[in-house]
């Protein structure tokens, strides 16, 4: 007080620094959390799914599960013909995933020698969880893919100069190649096979070391120029000659053309040919500034380099999403400030309201400055914490101002009133503030994994804000009181809103003391009713995302060709493209998109899969489009399922039921029985399992006698069949920095290969000039083989899943299907079941939350016990926390919100509010009872009357502070606003009526 100029200087500097920090602080959509997933891919050409399972997948699983960091229960493997995928998930406590994956990669490099010799590769992808900050397409119908790739390479070179840009990756590029279409009849006539042809071309594609010539002064390297410069040179390449000088060239036995091969996959943007560039951002940078830097480079590139017939389009733009999100939350923040100040003006004397209102921007901007210094970014979570705590930061000031006015009313000087009000209430305010802050921290220790990462900064943001507001209340507010509030404030004619509320409260309080046990019974009844209502609420720990964007996934049967997938995708595209609410449609046919949202995992795609990224005109239009098309188009095509997928913060299926066992037939029988029941439920669609139907393979069994006589081994036969039936790379031609693969292909003009024609394939023998049809040395017949064999935690597991129709309740459907499994489904011997999907995710999340809350309550218990030193009061305070339930659950029920992670944060905030109010009320009662020697009944009655106004004002400001959050339309944060608003109002009524009565009963 005596050095107020220094205090004001420090506060002013911190305030200005906070404004500067708001512009400079790193901004994100969500906190950076670790996606502890990766995929290990094993390639085993020629092996059936059963062979892949036994010889590759099982050894890989056993090896990977020797690492203690691997979460075995979530690690799955999929074995299919020639390949296996092992989806590896790390334990939640792993923070440095790069270190773990480095160990796994080194281990796999050594372990590969223990796998069968036929295993071609074991590849680890540990950046599976990396999310693209920006997806850009370069599209043109008049330019070739080579030209588009050239423009993309130029753009990439420019973007790499931006410090924050990382991981520039191209997608959708079609490779130009030199195709050699072999004529099998001519090859057979000359007595040579594809092996000779491929060997001759492969030797010309090498870049050999020519040595060097050196003398006493110089050393000159020898360079052998490549003989293949294009398709003409390839066609003229000699592949055979005899002593008489007769030669056989490639063009004599094959047709050589430069072309773009029929693609296995491709990307289109709004129906136009395009290539895509995926960009990520380095950690610790401001993504909004990142977007501005990229914009500047793009504008320069388009103006200087790009022709008019090449367009640049943004598909997914995290910088824009974050910018809009931050702008929306800052708008809500300032609107909430204005609402709180307006409410204070209505409920508080004008000058007192001005003093309290000053602390709102001071506390907020100083807190942002401290967050910037501490490295806490501005994202959806920290902004939500700022809004949630906004109404609470003025509470300390209101209590101090109310005490100041009380001292003035008793005739004390302004100086004495200002100093004594701050000194008297500081211990209670400190205890209440610490209790509120401490409530949030245990959840950081009990929640691990992605959710733990997600909430890391929430408690710190609240703590910084509340502690700053406490310091302002006891260090700055006293001087502002002297400066602004006169000794005797003029009384307005008539009664204020606060006076009317106080008069009503006195009558209610008198009634509650006359009917004490009835009042307590009503409080208990409210808790029971709230629990009954809570049991009827939906449970979903994380909601759907509010985006002007959604995805469409198209699934066909596993053996569907790309042409059929493209036809279905084109039909869906035309409908969406003609919809005025759709801004753009990006098609991924035969492939999946990069991860453009953190919780949207890319699919392992094939020719039977297509995906769209659809950008719409607004979030509401996204909902309307999904409502219109999702159910109507799901089964529009008889051979395809079209899934309209709303972007979700939950990365697990809604419904998932697992069957474990060792026998595939038993697993299929159990799964088929459940699927038959589920297909009768109108709420479900696309009921399926992850085990696809068996598919046919051609089984070639060499005759051991005939094949051995000709020197044909299994390996030699496999090489010949691969050369005859597939596209085989045999070399490369370089045109500057542009690589042209040379590929040996079958000439489809001679007719498509049929299953019956496989036996006519000529097999080259080690015996010179001898080639024989395959049917002469082997039996060729089609057989059935498993398409996929899935393991989970090292065991065979078949998973049944289904999509919910719009509006269906996942929790109710899970319960209904679980009853069918328990009561109606007869499981074969050795088969066990397990619930997965959203049910598993929710029940993995709830125990850590409950543990965190339990620890918080224990901490609060000891804080209150140390302060009051009486078990009775402590137990009453703990029991009073349940009074927040009634208003909160009624509010959630009326708003039709689910109980989830964010609504739980709202409940935790309510607990802190109630603890603060109870401490303020009971501390006053204890002072009157001990110091003034009043009876417990009189002390409780006076505490109710005296503390009702500050409790009413603090609760009102906290409740109205979240009104913008309630009506902001966010499915993520609106439940927090509803919980705090409705729960705060409900708990206010119950606390000020029931708590005084309970105090009087403690000492009776």
Residue ranges of each PLM-predicted region?
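Solvent-exposed, non-transmembrane alpha-helical starts
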Residues: 9, 48-55, 93-103, 132-135, ...
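Transmembrane helices with small-residue packing motifs
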Residues: 13-47, 95, 109-116, 443-454, ...
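Solvent-exposed, membrane-proximal periplasmic/extracellular interface segments of envelope transport
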Residues: 15, 51-127, 185-206, 227, ...
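Hydrophobic transmembrane alpha-helices and their membrane-interface caps
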Residues: 18-24, 338, 342-346, 350-405, ...
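Extracytoplasmic/periplasmic membrane-proximal domains and adjacent transmembrane bundles
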Residues: 83-85, 112, 158-338, 401, ...
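Helix-loop junctions and hydrophobic alpha-helical segments within the transmembrane domains
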Residues: 315, 322, 326, 401, ...
């Amino acid at each position: 007080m005596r050095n107020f100029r220094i205090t004001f200087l420090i506060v002013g500097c911190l305030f200005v620094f906070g404004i500067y920090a708001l512009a400079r602080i790193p901004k994100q959509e969500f906190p950076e959390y670790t996606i502890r997933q990766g995929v290990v891919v094993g390639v085993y050409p020629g092996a059936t799914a059963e062979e892949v399972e036994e010889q590759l997948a099982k050894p890989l699983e056993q090896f990977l599960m020797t690492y203690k960091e691997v979460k075995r229960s979530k690690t799955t493997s999929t074995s299919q013909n020639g390949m296996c995928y092992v989806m590896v998930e790390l334990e939640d406590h792993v923070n440095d995933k790069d270190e773990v994956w480095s160990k796994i990669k080194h281990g796999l490099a050594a372990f590969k020698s223990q796998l069968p010799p036929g295993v071609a590769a074991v590849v680890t992808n540990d950046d599976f969880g990396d999310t693209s900050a920006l997806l850009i397409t370069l599209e043109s119908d008049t330019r070739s893919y080579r030209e588009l790739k050239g423009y993309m390479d130029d753009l990439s070179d420019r973007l790499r100069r931006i410090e924050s840009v990382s991981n520039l990756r191209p997608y959708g590029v079609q490779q130009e190649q030199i195709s050699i279409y072999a004529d099998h009849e001519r090859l057979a006539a000359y007595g040579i096979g594809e092996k000779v042809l491929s060997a001759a071309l492969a030797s010309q594609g090498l870049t050999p070391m020519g040595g060097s010539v050196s003398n006493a002064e110089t050393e000159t390297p020898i360079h052998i120029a490549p003989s293949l410069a294009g398709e003409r040179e390839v066609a003229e390449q000699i592949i055979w000659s005899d002593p008489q000088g007769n030669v056989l060239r490639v063009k004599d036995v094959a047709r050589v053309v430069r072309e773009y091969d029929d693609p296995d996959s491709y990307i289109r943007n709004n129906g136009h040919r395009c290539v895509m560039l995926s960009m990520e951002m380095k950690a610790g940078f401001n993504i909004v500034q990142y977007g501005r830097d990229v914009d500047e480079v793009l504008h320069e590139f388009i103006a200087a380099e790009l022709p008019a017939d090449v367009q640049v389009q943004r598909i997914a733009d995290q910088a824009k999403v974050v910018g809009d999100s931050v702008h929306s939350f800052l708008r809500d923040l300032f609107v909430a400030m204005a609402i709180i100040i307006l409410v204070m003006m209505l409920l508080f004397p004008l000058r007192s309201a001005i003093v309290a209102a000053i602390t709102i921007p001071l506390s907020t901007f100083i807190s942002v400055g401290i967050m910037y210094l501490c490295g806490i970014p501005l994202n959806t979570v920290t902004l939500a914490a700022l809004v949630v705590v906004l109404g609470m930061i003025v509470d300390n000031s209101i209590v101090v101002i109310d005490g100041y006015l009380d001292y003035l009313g008793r005739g004390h000087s302004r100086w004495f009133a200002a100093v004594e009000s701050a000194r008297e209430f500081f211990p209670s305010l400190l205890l209440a503030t610490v209790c509120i802050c401490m409530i949030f921290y245990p959840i950081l220790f009990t929640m691990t994994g992605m959710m733990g990462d997600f909430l890391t900064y929430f408690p710190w943001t609240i703590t910084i804000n509340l502690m700053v507001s406490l310091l302002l209340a006891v260090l700055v507010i006293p001087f502002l009181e002297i400066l602004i509030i006169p000794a005797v404030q003029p009384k307005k004619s008539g009664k204020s809103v606060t006076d009317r509320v106080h008069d009503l409260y006195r009558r209610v309080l008198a009634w509650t003391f006359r009917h004490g046990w009835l009042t307590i019974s009503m409080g208990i009844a409210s808790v029971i009713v709230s629990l009954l209502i809570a049991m009827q609420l939906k449970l979903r720990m994380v909601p759907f995302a509010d985006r002007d964007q959604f995805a469409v996934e198209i699934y066909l049967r596993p053996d569907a060709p790309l042409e059929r997938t493209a036809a279905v995708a084109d039909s869906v595209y035309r409908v969406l493209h003609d919809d005025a609410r759709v801004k753009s449609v990006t098609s991924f046919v035969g492939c999946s998109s990069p991860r453009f949202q953190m919780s949207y995992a890319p699919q392992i795609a094939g020719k039977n899969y297509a995906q769209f990224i659809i950008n719409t005109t607004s979030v509401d239009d996204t909902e309307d489009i999904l409502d219109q098309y999702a159910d109507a188009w799901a089964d529009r095509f008889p051979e395809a399922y079209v899934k309209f997928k709303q972007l979700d913060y939950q990365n697990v299926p809604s419904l998932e039921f697992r069957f474990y066992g060792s026998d595939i037939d038993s697993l299929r029988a159990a799964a088929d029985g459940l699927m038959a029941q589920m297909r009768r439920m109108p709420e479900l669609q696309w009921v399926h399992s992850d085990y696809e139907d068996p598919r046919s393979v051609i089984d070639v069994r060499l005759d051991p006698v005939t094949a051995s006589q000709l020197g044909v081994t299994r390996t030699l036969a496999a090489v010949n069949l691969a050369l005859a039936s597939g596209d085989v790379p045999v070399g490369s031609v370089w045109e500057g920095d542009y690589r042209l693969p040379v590929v040996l292909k079958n000439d489809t003009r001679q007719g498509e290969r049929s299953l019956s024609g496989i036996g006519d394939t000529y097999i080259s023998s080690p015996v010179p000039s001898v080639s024989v049809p395959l049917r002469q040395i082997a039996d060729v017949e089609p057989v059935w083989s498993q398409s996929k064999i899935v393991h989970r935690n090292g065991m065979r597991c078949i998973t049944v899943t289904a999509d919910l129709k719009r509006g269906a309740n996942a929790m109710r459907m899970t319960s209904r299907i679980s009853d069918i499994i328990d009561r109606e489904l007869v499981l074969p011997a050795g088969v066990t079941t397990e619930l997965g999907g959203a049910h598993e995710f929710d029940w993995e999340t709830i125990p850590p939350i409950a543990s965190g809350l339990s620890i918080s309550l224990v901490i609060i218990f000891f804080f209150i016990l140390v302060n009051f030193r009486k078990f009775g009061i402590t137990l009453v305070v703990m029991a009073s926390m349940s009074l927040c339930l009634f208003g909160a659950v009624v509010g959630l029920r009326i708003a039709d919100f689910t109980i989830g992670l964010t609504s739980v944060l709202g409940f935790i905030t309510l607990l802190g509010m109630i603890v603060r109010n109870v401490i303020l009320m009971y501390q006053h009662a204890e002072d009157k009872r001990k110091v003034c020697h009043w009876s417990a009944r009189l002390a409780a009655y006076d505490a109710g009357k005296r503390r009702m106004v500050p409790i009413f004002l603090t609760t009102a400001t906290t409740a109205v502070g979240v009104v913008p959050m309630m009506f902001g339309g966010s499915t993520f944060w609106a439940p927090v606003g509803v919980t705090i608003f409705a729960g705060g109002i409900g708990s206010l009524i119950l606390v000020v009526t029931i708590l005084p009565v309970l105090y009087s009963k403690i000492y009776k």
